[in-house]
């Protein structure tokens, strides 16, 4: 014991010195006669290597705590382990703030750059911006319209553009707009709309909050995001409409927006009133059957509402696309970066709800160099055959609109849609009856439901007896 008492304090001090600064322990191991000088040198070494004073205090506190258990313990391993733990924690605490400011630097170049595709548009080389996966489709859809309208121009050799440059061009367009009316009230309202649009600009790079209404192709719940489209004079359309020939769906959906309809479905399904439960189920079925967010009635209304040669933004499946109308047909601008080198792929036809479309070039001629299906024709065909295919395609589309109308003034397509809708209505009408019968059967299981169940059980008994014989 006498041998351990004079040596235990020295390892304890050595443990604290090693836990903080291992290099100072070798220098300070020589002078054992002046422990105060060694403590002062330890403090100086700690202050030089570690600037924060709190980190120099943490090991000293651990050293003070080690002095009390030393007479009880015969060895000093617990001392260095307790002395090293605060050091590890302080090192991690110092290293974490150093990594945080580096993360924004690494994230900056990732979503900023977008490839520019040059297309011949009405006799002039015009740029359009392509997007990769999860790109800022609202910003690109608006900017592509401004490029196609030649309100924003880029240098001829521009191949890559950043989102900051796009935002700057869009901001300049908004600030250059002047109110048409000179009255003070309208000017104040116009200035307020400009301020709202400028505050919304950063959201265009991430996504817009758009809430559709199912009553019209241009019916949206007004939000500050819509002020950007209003100021630029860009129409915003959608095709998610309720068919007026389905009165039950019209009654269940009404004039509600999408968010309001979802809330109503939840409240109706938890209601004790069977009529409200039925309306909630009908509204829920409407959302499920129209999950593509485009109906045939909406497509017809969209074709009628869009003007010839008009450039607009089409919203579907939480995606914004640049849309135009050419010769009574709707086309969507192809902005997928995978078609960057495909000069003949510029527009995509929108004539079907199921997504069956065709690619066209900048002059709305059917593209033969690339197709969506495996049986698409290649570019090796002669010009005569390509021209014949173009004519056949245009004739097929024109016949779709020039079909002879029946006694009710409906085309074959509309008649087929009406028959499909009538069948859908019959299914909807049968569902409430089935639901009510189920509710009644659940309520009156005691007496009425026993007889048919007993009869159904007797039949398999006879069949089983016959099988056994």
From Swiss-Prot:
> Has keyword Hydrolase?
yes
Residues bearing the modification Phosphoserine: 103, 441
- What protein does this entry describe? Ubiquitin carboxyl-terminal hydrolase MINDY-1
- Cite a GO CC annotation: nuclear body
Q: Which ranges does the record mark as transmembrane?
A: none
Q: Describe what happens upon changing residue 319 to A.
A: Abolishes ubiquitin hydrolase activity
Q: Where is the composition biased (Low complexity)?
A: 66-76
What changing residue 408 to A does, per the record, is: No effect on binding to 'Lys-48' tetraubiquitin chains
Known role: Hydrolase that can specifically remove 'Lys-48'-linked conjugated ubiquitin from proteins. Has exodeubiquitinase activity and has a preference for long polyubiquitin chains. May play a regulatory role at the level of protein turnover.
Catalytic residues?
Answer: 137 (nucleophile), 319 (proton acceptor)
From the UniProt entry, list the residue stretches annotated as the region Ubiquitin-binding domain (UBD): 388-426
Originating species: Homo sapiens
Q: Which family does it belong to?
A: Belongs to the MINDY deubiquitinase family. FAM63 subfamily.
Q: What are the site positions for Ubiquitin-binding?
A: 412, 415-416, 419
Q: Which gene encodes it?
A: MINDY1
* S-S bonds: none
The reply to whether Hydrolase figures as a keyword in the UniProt entry is yes
MF terms (GO), sorted A to Z: cysteine-type carboxypeptidase activity; cysteine-type deubiquitinase activity; K48-linked deubiquitinase activity; K48-linked polyubiquitin modification-dependent protein binding
* E.C. no: 3.4.19.12
The protein's UniProt keywords, in alphabetical order, are: Hydrolase, Phosphoprotein, Protease, Thiol protease, Ubl conjugation pathway
Catalytic activity annotation: Thiol-dependent hydrolysis of ester, thioester, amide, peptide and isopeptide bonds formed by the C-terminal Gly of ubiquitin (a 76-residue protein attached to proteins as an intracellular targeting signal)
Query: Which Pfam families does the UniProt record give?
Result: MINDY_DUB (PF04424)
Please list where the region (Disordered) is annotated.
Answer: 1-85, 441-469
Q: What is the effect of changing residue 424 to F/W?
A: No effect on binding to 'Lys-48' tetraubiquitin chains
- GO BP: any one term: proteolysis
- Reported impact of residue 416 to S: No effect on binding to 'Lys-48' tetraubiquitin chains
């Amino acid at each position: 014991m006498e041998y351990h008492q004079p040596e235990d304090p020295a390892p304890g001090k050595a443990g604290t010195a090693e836990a903080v600064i291992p290099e100072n322990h070798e220098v300070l191991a020589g002078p054992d006669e002046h422990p105060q000088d060694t403590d002062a040198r330890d403090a100086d070494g700690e202050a030089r290597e570690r600037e924060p004073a709190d980190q120099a205090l943490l090991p000293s506190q651990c050293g003070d705590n080690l002095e009390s258990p030393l007479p009880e313990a015969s060895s000093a391993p617990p001392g260095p382990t307790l002395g090293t733990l605060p050091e590890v924690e302080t090192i991690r605490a110092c290293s974490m703030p150093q990594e945080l400011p580096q993360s924004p630097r690494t994230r900056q170049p990732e979503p900023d750059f977008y490839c520019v595709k040059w297309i011949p548009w009405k006799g002039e080389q015009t740029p359009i911006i392509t997007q990769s996966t999860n790109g800022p489709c609202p910003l690109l859809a608006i900017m592509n319209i401004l490029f196609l309208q030649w309100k924003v121009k880029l240098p001829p050799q521009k191949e890559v553009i950043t989102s900051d440059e796009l935002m700057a061009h869009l901001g300049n367009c908004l600030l250059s707009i002047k109110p048409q009316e000179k009255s003070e009230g309208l000017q104040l309202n116009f200035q307020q709309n400009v301020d709202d649009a400028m505050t919304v600009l950063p959201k265009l790079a991430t996504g817009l909050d758009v809430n559709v209404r199912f009553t019209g192709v241009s019916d949206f719940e007004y939000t500050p995001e819509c002020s950007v489209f209003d100021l630029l004079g860009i129409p915003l359309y959608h095709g998610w409409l309720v068919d007026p020939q389905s009165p039950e769906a019209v009654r269940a959906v009404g004039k509600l927006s999408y968010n309001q309809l979802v809330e109503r479905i939840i409240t109706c399904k938890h209601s004790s009133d069977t009529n409200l439960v039925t309306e909630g189920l009908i509204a829920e079925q409407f959302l499920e059957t129209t999950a593509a967010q485009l109906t045939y009635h909406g497509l017809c209304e969209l074709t009628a509402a869009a003007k010839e040669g008009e450039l607009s933004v089409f919203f579907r499946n939480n995606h914004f696309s640049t849309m135009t109308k050419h010769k009574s047909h709707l086309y969507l601008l192809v902005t997928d970066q995978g078609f960057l080198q495909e000069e003949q792929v510029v527009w995509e036809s929108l004539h079907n709800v199921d997504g069956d479309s065709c690619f066209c070039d900048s002059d709305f001629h059917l593209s033969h160099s690339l197709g969506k299906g495996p049986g698409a024709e290649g570019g090796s065909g002669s010009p005569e055959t390509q021209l014949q295919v173009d004519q056949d395609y245009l004739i097929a589309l024109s016949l779709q609109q020039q079909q002879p109308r029946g006694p009710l003034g409906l085309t074959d397509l509309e008649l087929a849609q009406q028959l499909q809708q009538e069948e859908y209505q019959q299914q909807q009408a049968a569902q409430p009856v089935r639901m009510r019968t189920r509710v009644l059967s659940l309520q009156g299981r005691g007496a009425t439901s026993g007889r048919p169940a007993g009869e159904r059980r007797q039949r398999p008994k006879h069949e089983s007896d016959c099988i056994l014989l």
